[in-house]
Amino acid sequence: MKKKITETSSIMFSSPKNQQSKQYINENVWDDQYLIDVYEKSINQYIEAHNEKNKKNRNKNKEINNVEDDISNNNNNNNSNNKTIDNNKNKIGSKNNINNNSTTTNTNKNKINKQKQQQQNNLDKETDTKDDYNSGDYYNEYEDDNGEDNDYQERKGYYQSNKDHDYYHNGENNYQNQYNPNYFYQSQHYQQQQPPQNFNNQYQPHHHHHHHQQYPNHHSYNYNREQYQNPYSQPPPTPTNYPPMQTNFQPPPMPTILPQGDDELADLLLSWYYSGYYTGVYQERKRNSRLNQTPHPNHINHHRYNNNNNNNNNNNNNNNNNNNNNNNNNNNSNNNNNNNNNNNNNKSNSNSNNKKLPKFTNIPKTKETN
Protein backbone atom coordinates (compact mmCIF):
# COMPACT_ATOMS: atom_id res chain seq x y z
CA MET A 1 0.00 0.00 0.00
CA LYS A 2 2.85 2.36 -0.68
CA LYS A 3 2.22 5.54 -2.61
CA LYS A 4 4.29 8.41 -3.86
CA ILE A 5 3.81 11.28 -1.44
CA THR A 6 5.20 14.78 -1.76
CA GLU A 7 7.47 15.75 1.06
CA THR A 8 8.61 19.23 2.07
CA SER A 9 11.88 20.26 3.64
CA SER A 10 10.13 20.56 7.03
CA ILE A 11 9.56 17.69 9.39
CA MET A 12 5.81 17.37 8.89
CA PHE A 13 4.35 16.07 5.68
CA SER A 14 2.49 18.51 3.47
CA SER A 15 -1.02 17.90 2.29
CA PRO A 16 -1.86 18.13 -1.40
CA LYS A 17 -3.80 21.34 -0.67
CA ASN A 18 -0.73 23.22 0.50
CA GLN A 19 1.93 22.21 -1.96
CA GLN A 20 5.08 24.28 -1.90
CA SER A 21 7.74 24.83 -4.53
CA LYS A 22 10.28 22.44 -2.97
CA GLN A 23 8.86 18.98 -3.38
CA TYR A 24 10.64 15.69 -2.90
CA ILE A 25 9.33 12.32 -3.96
CA ASN A 26 9.90 9.44 -1.59
CA GLU A 27 8.48 6.03 -2.40
CA ASN A 28 9.29 4.47 1.00
CA VAL A 29 6.86 6.68 2.98
CA TRP A 30 3.46 5.35 4.00
CA ASP A 31 0.29 7.21 2.97
CA ASP A 32 -0.74 9.04 6.16
CA GLN A 33 -3.35 11.30 4.58
CA TYR A 34 -5.89 10.57 7.31
CA LEU A 35 -3.49 11.68 10.04
CA ILE A 36 -2.62 14.80 8.07
CA ASP A 37 -6.31 15.78 7.82
CA VAL A 38 -6.79 15.26 11.55
CA TYR A 39 -3.79 17.48 12.31
CA GLU A 40 -5.15 20.21 10.04
CA LYS A 41 -8.57 20.12 11.71
CA SER A 42 -7.06 20.36 15.17
CA ILE A 43 -4.84 23.28 14.12
CA ASN A 44 -7.81 25.17 12.62
CA GLN A 45 -9.87 24.61 15.78
CA TYR A 46 -7.03 25.94 17.91
CA ILE A 47 -6.75 29.07 15.74
CA GLU A 48 -10.50 29.72 15.89
CA ALA A 49 -10.56 29.28 19.64
CA HIS A 50 -7.86 31.92 20.13
CA ASN A 51 -9.25 34.40 17.61
CA GLU A 52 -10.32 37.70 19.24
CA LYS A 53 -13.38 38.23 17.03
CA ASN A 54 -14.71 34.83 17.87
CA LYS A 55 -14.06 35.49 21.57
CA LYS A 56 -16.16 38.68 21.49
CA ASN A 57 -19.04 36.95 19.72
CA ARG A 58 -18.94 34.11 22.22
CA ASN A 59 -19.04 36.50 25.18
CA LYS A 60 -22.07 38.30 23.72
CA ASN A 61 -23.88 35.05 23.17
CA LYS A 62 -23.09 34.01 26.73
CA GLU A 63 -24.53 37.25 28.15
CA ILE A 64 -27.72 36.88 26.12
CA ASN A 65 -28.14 33.30 27.24
CA ASN A 66 -27.57 34.26 30.88
CA VAL A 67 -30.28 36.96 30.71
CA GLU A 68 -32.74 34.53 29.17
CA ASP A 69 -31.96 31.95 31.83
CA ASP A 70 -32.55 34.52 34.62
CA ILE A 71 -35.94 35.47 33.16
CA SER A 72 -37.03 31.86 32.88
CA ASN A 73 -35.88 31.15 36.45
CA ASN A 74 -37.86 34.13 37.80
CA ASN A 75 -41.01 32.95 36.01
CA ASN A 76 -40.60 29.48 37.42
CA ASN A 77 -40.11 30.86 40.94
CA ASN A 78 -43.27 33.00 40.70
CA ASN A 79 -45.32 30.03 39.54
CA SER A 80 -44.01 27.89 42.37
CA ASN A 81 -44.76 30.63 44.95
CA ASN A 82 -48.34 30.96 43.71
CA LYS A 83 -48.80 27.21 43.96
CA THR A 84 -47.51 27.15 47.53
CA ILE A 85 -49.85 30.00 48.53
CA ASP A 86 -52.86 28.13 47.12
CA ASN A 87 -51.84 24.95 48.86
CA ASN A 88 -51.44 26.78 52.16
CA LYS A 89 -54.90 28.30 51.82
CA ASN A 90 -56.42 24.90 51.21
CA LYS A 91 -54.57 23.46 54.19
CA ILE A 92 -55.71 26.30 56.48
CA GLY A 93 -59.33 25.83 55.40
CA SER A 94 -59.20 22.10 56.03
CA LYS A 95 -57.60 22.67 59.44
CA ASN A 96 -60.34 25.11 60.44
CA ASN A 97 -63.00 22.59 59.49
CA ILE A 98 -61.24 19.88 61.46
CA ASN A 99 -60.87 22.15 64.50
CA ASN A 100 -64.53 23.13 64.39
CA ASN A 101 -65.58 19.51 64.19
CA SER A 102 -63.24 18.52 66.99
CA THR A 103 -64.46 21.33 69.27
CA THR A 104 -68.06 20.32 68.73
CA THR A 105 -67.32 16.69 69.48
CA ASN A 106 -65.35 17.63 72.60
CA THR A 107 -68.14 19.83 73.95
CA ASN A 108 -70.68 17.06 73.41
CA LYS A 109 -68.45 14.56 75.23
CA ASN A 110 -67.96 16.94 78.15
CA LYS A 111 -71.72 17.43 78.48
CA ILE A 112 -72.32 13.68 78.53
CA ASN A 113 -69.62 13.13 81.13
CA LYS A 114 -71.04 15.86 83.36
CA GLN A 115 -74.49 14.35 83.18
CA LYS A 116 -73.16 10.92 84.14
CA GLN A 117 -71.26 12.35 87.09
CA GLN A 118 -74.36 14.17 88.35
CA GLN A 119 -76.40 10.99 88.13
CA GLN A 120 -73.80 9.01 90.07
CA ASN A 121 -73.57 11.72 92.73
CA ASN A 122 -77.34 11.74 93.13
CA LEU A 123 -77.39 7.95 93.56
CA ASP A 124 -74.64 8.11 96.17
CA LYS A 125 -76.50 10.79 98.09
CA GLU A 126 -79.71 8.79 98.03
CA THR A 127 -78.01 5.70 99.40
CA ASP A 128 -76.30 7.72 102.13
CA THR A 129 -79.53 9.41 103.19
CA LYS A 130 -81.35 6.06 103.33
CA ASP A 131 -78.68 4.58 105.56
CA ASP A 132 -78.69 7.60 107.83
CA TYR A 133 -82.49 7.60 108.05
CA ASN A 134 -82.53 3.93 109.00
CA SER A 135 -79.83 4.43 111.65
CA GLY A 136 -81.69 7.38 113.14
CA ASP A 137 -79.27 10.05 111.98
CA TYR A 138 -80.96 11.94 109.19
CA TYR A 139 -78.08 14.31 108.68
CA ASN A 140 -74.49 13.56 107.59
CA GLU A 141 -71.98 13.98 110.38
CA TYR A 142 -68.99 13.91 108.06
CA GLU A 143 -69.89 16.88 105.93
CA ASP A 144 -67.94 20.09 106.34
CA ASP A 145 -69.24 23.55 105.88
CA ASN A 146 -68.28 23.35 102.24
CA GLY A 147 -70.34 20.20 101.76
CA GLU A 148 -67.36 17.85 101.14
CA ASP A 149 -67.45 14.27 102.35
CA ASN A 150 -64.49 13.60 104.66
CA ASP A 151 -65.23 9.88 104.76
CA TYR A 152 -64.73 9.63 100.99
CA GLN A 153 -61.44 11.52 101.21
CA GLU A 154 -60.20 9.25 104.01
CA ARG A 155 -61.14 6.15 102.07
CA LYS A 156 -59.40 7.52 98.97
CA GLY A 157 -56.20 8.19 100.93
CA TYR A 158 -56.34 4.69 102.45
CA TYR A 159 -56.45 3.06 99.04
CA GLN A 160 -53.61 5.20 97.78
CA SER A 161 -51.45 4.37 100.81
CA ASN A 162 -52.05 0.64 100.31
CA LYS A 163 -51.09 0.90 96.65
CA ASP A 164 -47.85 2.69 97.50
CA HIS A 165 -47.06 0.08 100.15
CA ASP A 166 -47.49 -2.82 97.73
CA TYR A 167 -45.59 -0.98 95.04
CA TYR A 168 -42.63 -0.50 97.36
CA HIS A 169 -42.54 -4.10 98.62
CA ASN A 170 -42.86 -5.63 95.16
CA GLY A 171 -39.56 -4.01 94.19
CA GLU A 172 -41.03 -1.89 91.42
CA ASN A 173 -39.97 1.28 93.17
CA ASN A 174 -37.01 0.22 95.29
CA TYR A 175 -35.69 3.40 96.87
CA GLN A 176 -32.65 1.68 98.39
CA ASN A 177 -31.31 0.67 94.96
CA GLN A 178 -32.42 3.83 93.25
CA TYR A 179 -28.96 5.40 93.41
CA ASN A 180 -27.07 2.17 92.64
CA PRO A 181 -26.08 2.36 88.95
CA ASN A 182 -25.17 -1.35 88.79
CA TYR A 183 -28.51 -2.56 90.20
CA PHE A 184 -30.23 -3.03 86.86
CA TYR A 185 -27.20 -4.69 85.29
CA GLN A 186 -26.71 -7.02 88.29
CA SER A 187 -30.32 -8.11 88.33
CA GLN A 188 -30.34 -8.72 84.59
CA HIS A 189 -27.03 -10.60 84.74
CA TYR A 190 -28.30 -12.72 87.62
CA GLN A 191 -31.40 -13.68 85.67
CA GLN A 192 -29.37 -14.64 82.62
CA GLN A 193 -26.81 -16.70 84.56
CA GLN A 194 -29.42 -18.93 86.25
CA PRO A 195 -29.07 -22.54 85.05
CA PRO A 196 -32.02 -24.27 83.39
CA GLN A 197 -34.10 -26.35 85.80
CA ASN A 198 -35.13 -29.75 84.52
CA PHE A 199 -37.79 -31.14 86.88
CA ASN A 200 -38.10 -34.43 85.00
CA ASN A 201 -34.52 -35.39 85.84
CA GLN A 202 -34.79 -34.26 89.45
CA TYR A 203 -35.08 -37.75 90.98
CA GLN A 204 -32.42 -39.83 89.28
CA PRO A 205 -29.95 -42.48 90.52
CA HIS A 206 -26.82 -41.46 92.31
CA HIS A 207 -24.48 -41.75 89.35
CA HIS A 208 -26.60 -39.25 87.38
CA HIS A 209 -26.28 -36.47 89.94
CA HIS A 210 -23.14 -34.88 88.62
CA HIS A 211 -22.36 -31.24 88.84
CA HIS A 212 -21.37 -30.79 85.22
CA GLN A 213 -24.64 -32.25 83.90
CA GLN A 214 -27.15 -30.07 85.70
CA TYR A 215 -25.00 -26.95 85.83
CA PRO A 216 -22.76 -26.59 82.78
CA ASN A 217 -19.28 -25.26 83.27
CA HIS A 218 -18.92 -21.55 82.66
CA HIS A 219 -15.61 -22.09 80.84
CA SER A 220 -17.20 -23.90 77.90
CA TYR A 221 -16.76 -21.66 74.87
CA ASN A 222 -17.95 -22.11 71.32
CA TYR A 223 -14.77 -20.76 69.76
CA ASN A 224 -11.19 -21.97 69.61
CA ARG A 225 -9.12 -20.47 72.42
CA GLU A 226 -5.79 -20.86 70.64
CA GLN A 227 -7.03 -18.69 67.82
CA TYR A 228 -7.41 -15.74 70.21
CA GLN A 229 -4.68 -16.46 72.75
CA ASN A 230 -1.89 -17.18 70.25
CA PRO A 231 -2.64 -15.70 66.82
CA TYR A 232 0.79 -16.77 65.53
CA SER A 233 -0.08 -20.46 65.94
CA GLN A 234 -2.22 -20.41 62.82
CA PRO A 235 -0.74 -22.03 59.71
CA PRO A 236 0.71 -19.67 57.14
CA PRO A 237 -1.40 -18.83 54.11
CA THR A 238 -1.11 -21.10 51.13
CA PRO A 239 1.33 -19.75 48.54
CA THR A 240 0.04 -18.61 45.20
CA ASN A 241 0.68 -20.41 41.94
CA TYR A 242 2.84 -17.64 40.55
CA PRO A 243 6.30 -18.65 39.33
CA PRO A 244 9.21 -17.50 41.48
CA MET A 245 11.08 -14.36 40.52
CA GLN A 246 14.28 -14.81 38.55
CA THR A 247 17.00 -13.02 40.44
CA ASN A 248 19.92 -13.89 38.15
CA PHE A 249 18.13 -13.32 34.88
CA GLN A 250 20.38 -12.61 31.91
CA PRO A 251 18.68 -11.99 28.59
CA PRO A 252 20.21 -13.60 25.52
CA PRO A 253 22.39 -11.45 23.29
CA MET A 254 20.93 -9.48 20.44
CA PRO A 255 20.20 -11.75 17.45
CA THR A 256 22.92 -11.50 14.83
CA ILE A 257 20.88 -13.26 12.15
CA LEU A 258 18.45 -10.72 10.71
CA PRO A 259 16.02 -11.34 7.85
CA GLN A 260 17.74 -10.47 4.63
CA GLY A 261 16.03 -8.39 1.98
CA ASP A 262 13.18 -7.19 4.24
CA ASP A 263 14.08 -4.00 6.08
CA GLU A 264 10.62 -3.49 7.61
CA LEU A 265 10.64 -6.88 9.26
CA ALA A 266 14.12 -6.21 10.60
CA ASP A 267 12.94 -2.91 12.10
CA LEU A 268 9.98 -4.62 13.73
CA LEU A 269 12.22 -7.34 15.07
CA LEU A 270 14.62 -4.86 16.64
CA SER A 271 11.82 -2.73 18.10
CA TRP A 272 10.12 -5.74 19.66
CA TYR A 273 13.43 -7.02 20.94
CA TYR A 274 14.27 -3.76 22.71
CA SER A 275 10.75 -3.45 24.14
CA GLY A 276 11.00 -6.89 25.72
CA TYR A 277 8.92 -8.99 23.33
CA TYR A 278 10.21 -11.81 21.14
CA THR A 279 8.52 -12.50 17.84
CA GLY A 280 7.80 -15.85 16.35
CA VAL A 281 10.34 -15.15 13.62
CA TYR A 282 13.14 -14.83 16.16
CA GLN A 283 12.02 -17.97 17.96
CA GLU A 284 12.00 -19.96 14.72
CA ARG A 285 15.43 -18.69 13.76
CA LYS A 286 16.69 -19.52 17.21
CA ARG A 287 15.44 -23.10 16.89
CA ASN A 288 17.07 -23.47 13.47
CA SER A 289 20.33 -22.02 14.77
CA ARG A 290 20.41 -24.56 17.59
CA LEU A 291 20.40 -27.37 15.08
CA ASN A 292 23.17 -25.86 12.96
CA GLN A 293 25.40 -24.21 15.56
CA THR A 294 27.62 -25.76 18.20
CA PRO A 295 26.18 -26.05 21.71
CA HIS A 296 26.42 -23.18 24.09
CA PRO A 297 29.67 -23.05 26.11
CA ASN A 298 27.69 -23.01 29.33
CA HIS A 299 26.12 -26.32 28.39
CA ILE A 300 29.57 -27.75 27.57
CA ASN A 301 30.96 -26.66 30.89
CA HIS A 302 27.93 -28.09 32.59
CA HIS A 303 28.53 -31.50 31.04
CA ARG A 304 32.21 -31.28 31.84
CA TYR A 305 31.42 -30.45 35.40
CA ASN A 306 29.12 -33.43 35.67
CA ASN A 307 31.78 -35.73 34.15
CA ASN A 308 34.39 -34.43 36.56
CA ASN A 309 32.06 -35.04 39.46
CA ASN A 310 31.46 -38.60 38.32
CA ASN A 311 35.19 -39.24 37.95
CA ASN A 312 35.86 -37.78 41.36
CA ASN A 313 33.19 -39.98 42.87
CA ASN A 314 34.70 -43.06 41.25
CA ASN A 315 38.17 -42.15 42.51
CA ASN A 316 36.82 -41.65 45.99
CA ASN A 317 35.16 -45.03 45.87
CA ASN A 318 38.42 -46.66 44.77
CA ASN A 319 40.31 -44.94 47.56
CA ASN A 320 37.76 -46.16 50.05
CA ASN A 321 38.18 -49.70 48.78
CA ASN A 322 41.96 -49.44 49.09
CA ASN A 323 41.64 -48.16 52.61
CA ASN A 324 39.39 -51.04 53.49
CA ASN A 325 41.93 -53.50 52.09
CA ASN A 326 44.71 -51.87 54.10
CA ASN A 327 42.63 -52.10 57.22
CA ASN A 328 42.04 -55.77 56.59
CA ASN A 329 45.78 -56.35 56.15
CA ASN A 330 46.52 -54.53 59.37
CA ASN A 331 43.98 -56.64 61.19
CA ASN A 332 45.58 -59.79 59.85
CA SER A 333 49.04 -58.68 60.98
CA ASN A 334 47.69 -57.88 64.43
CA ASN A 335 46.19 -61.33 64.65
CA ASN A 336 49.53 -62.88 63.72
CA ASN A 337 51.31 -60.87 66.39
CA ASN A 338 48.81 -61.98 68.97
CA ASN A 339 49.36 -65.59 68.01
CA ASN A 340 53.13 -65.21 68.34
CA ASN A 341 52.77 -63.68 71.77
CA ASN A 342 50.60 -66.54 72.90
CA ASN A 343 53.17 -69.06 71.72
CA ASN A 344 55.96 -67.30 73.58
CA ASN A 345 53.96 -67.28 76.77
CA ASN A 346 53.28 -70.95 76.52
CA LYS A 347 56.97 -71.70 76.05
CA SER A 348 57.98 -69.66 79.09
CA ASN A 349 55.46 -71.46 81.25
CA SER A 350 56.73 -74.86 80.20
CA ASN A 351 60.33 -73.90 80.96
CA SER A 352 59.45 -72.73 84.42
CA ASN A 353 57.74 -76.00 85.18
CA ASN A 354 60.75 -78.11 84.08
CA LYS A 355 63.25 -76.37 86.43
CA LYS A 356 64.40 -78.39 89.56
CA LEU A 357 63.89 -76.94 92.99
CA PRO A 358 67.10 -76.13 95.01
CA LYS A 359 68.09 -78.41 97.85
CA PHE A 360 68.13 -76.81 101.32
CA THR A 361 70.71 -78.92 103.23
CA ASN A 362 71.64 -76.43 105.90
CA ILE A 363 68.19 -76.19 107.45
CA PRO A 364 68.51 -75.91 111.28
CA LYS A 365 66.79 -78.64 113.24
CA THR A 366 64.27 -77.75 115.89
CA LYS A 367 64.62 -78.99 119.48
CA GLU A 368 61.98 -81.36 120.66
CA THR A 369 60.05 -80.20 123.64
CA ASN A 370 59.10 -82.55 126.42
From Swiss-Prot:
- Its recorded name reads Component of gems protein 1
Question: Does the record's keyword annotation contain Cytoplasm?
Answer: yes
**Main location class:** nucleus
Q: Supply the InterPro entries for this chain.
A: Smn1 (IPR040424), SMN_C (IPR047313)
Q: Where is the composition biased (Acidic residues)?
A: 140-151
The UniProt entry's coiled-coil ranges are 39-135
What residue spans carry the region label Disordered? 1-21, 66-154, 189-218, 291-370
Q: Where is the composition biased (Basic and acidic residues)?
A: 123-133
Where is there biased composition of kind Low complexity?
Answer: 72-122, 189-204, 306-354
Query: Which UniProt keywords are given for this protein, alphabetically ordered?
Result: Coiled coil, Cytoplasm, mRNA processing, mRNA splicing, Nucleus, RNA-binding, Spliceosome
